[in-house]
Amino acid sequence: MIHSLFLINCSGDIFLEKHWKSVVSQSVCDYFFEAQEKAADVENVPTVISTPHHYLISIYRDKLFFVSVIQTEVPPLFVIEFLHRVADTFQDYFGECSEAAIKDNVVIVYELLEEMLDNGFPLATESNILKELIKPPTILRSVVNSITGSSNVGDTLPTGQLSNIPWRRAGVKYTNNEAYFDVVEEIDAIIDKSGSTVFAEIQGVIDACIKLSGMPDLSLSFMNPRLLDDVSFHPCIRFKRWESERVLSFIPPDGNFRLISYRVSSQNLVAIPVYVKHNISFKENSSCGRFDITIGPKQNMGKTIEGITVTVHMPKVVLNMNLTPTQGSYTFDPVTKVLAWDVGKITPQKLPSLKGLVNLQSGAPKPEENPNLNIQFKIQQLAISGLKVNRLDMYGEKYKPFKGVKYITKAGKFQVRT
């Protein structure tokens, strides 16, 4: 299936390549570089590129391109999913999927790629199995390997490889048995000038940290599971149980993993947590304008909205801005024309505002349209969709584990039009 894999940075340098069958020349990447030059943005490079003798299928992750070379027709999503699994494995092993981390651990990278693909076909892609085959890097292990000349490859075959549950290794033991879940939701929204919602959608994930001994069988139920759309499951989930009862039943992997991702697309279910009052005006034949924005919580949810930042891309005719914030601090870059206001947390009793004058180029025409406000925020212990975990039951083991659920709401692409 996959003949070769090239890792390319944003500068266009191929800093790592791996071949599973015959060696493919780096010149095949010229087709990718041509498509990259034509793209308006790095994220707009075509995922699938056809060449006279190959197909190039790529993903863009953490400022790196993972470019695979295919010689026969295969489902592109199959290859894309595998490339994302490779990037996730690097993230899990090294703490980050960056060029520096990959270069620092290049031997382990090649060992991982050798195990993940067998003659070009996916073999071992589950983190639990890979960590039995190839030990994650540590400072002590790196020192020992440099002295003894040994590698991170394990001495024994993984016990889970022949198991019916490939994502969980056998013989897991913990002194403290714990199961924690993070429900993280991002709001993507567009708010018009009058404050009405043009578009709103919630993207959510449930991340799990499972440290349980033995082979536990878990069931996670929700108060209101029907609001979830387009649910994507970890392979451990029993899909028929979800279809019939809307309960997540699974034997979990050991450690950290993403249990599900989901979407809430019904706009009447999406509550917008903040509002913005704005008055941005530019006078005709004048060298100044007015800038006035106030941000506050839209409804009393009993939770504090924190980590608020407002980013505004001002028109090119703006020279400088003289503003006064009632809370936080702001910066304005006269080169990029980007205004950034770091607000912090807000309370209904004291609404933060940013007011002042905008200096324009003399003689320049009035800007045709006002800039948009891009807002970031975070709300702890709240799932904005209203999703709530009802209970977690465990079967197959006799001990009583520690259980916990944490909710976080964040702004995704949250834009206010002025």
Swiss-Prot record:
PROSITE patterns: CLAT_ADAPTOR_M_1, CLAT_ADAPTOR_M_2, MHD. GO terms for molecular function: small GTPase binding. GO terms for biological process: anterograde axonal transport; anterograde synaptic vesicle transport; endocytosis; intracellular protein transport; postsynaptic neurotransmitter receptor internalization. SUPFAM superfamilies: Second domain of Mu2 adaptin subunit (ap50) of ap2 adaptor, SNARE-like. It comes from the Eukaryota. It is a peripheral membrane protein. Keywords: Cytoplasmic vesicle, Golgi apparatus, Membrane, Protein transport, Transport. CDD domains: AP-3_Mu3A_Cterm, AP3_Mu_N. One of its GO terms (cellular component) is cytoplasmic vesicle. InterPro entries: Adaptor_comp_med_subunit, AP2_Mu_C_sf, AP_mu_sigma_su, Clathrin_mu, Clathrin_mu_CS, Longin-like_dom_sf, MHD. Its main location: Golgi. Residues 176-417 form the MHD domain. It is found in: Golgi apparatus; Cytoplasmic vesicle membrane. It holds the Pfam family Adap_comp_sub. Signal peptide: none annotated. Adaptor protein complex 3 (AP-3) is a heterotetramer composed of two large adaptins (delta-type subunit AP3D1 and beta-type subunit AP3B1 or AP3B2), a medium adaptin (mu-type subunit AP3M1 or AP3M2) and a small adaptin (sigma-type subunit APS1 or AP3S2). Interacts with AGAP1. AP-3 associates with the BLOC-1 complex. Belongs to the adaptor complexes medium subunit family. Part of the AP-3 complex, an adaptor-related complex which is not clathrin-associated. The complex is associated with the Golgi region as well as more peripheral structures. It facilitates the budding of vesicles from the Golgi membrane and may be directly involved in trafficking to lysosomes. In concert with the BLOC-1 complex, AP-3 is required to target cargos into vesicles assembled at cell bodies for delivery into neurites and nerve terminals. PANTHER family: AP COMPLEX SUBUNIT MU. This is AP-3 complex subunit mu-1. It comes from Rattus norvegicus. The gene is Ap3m1.
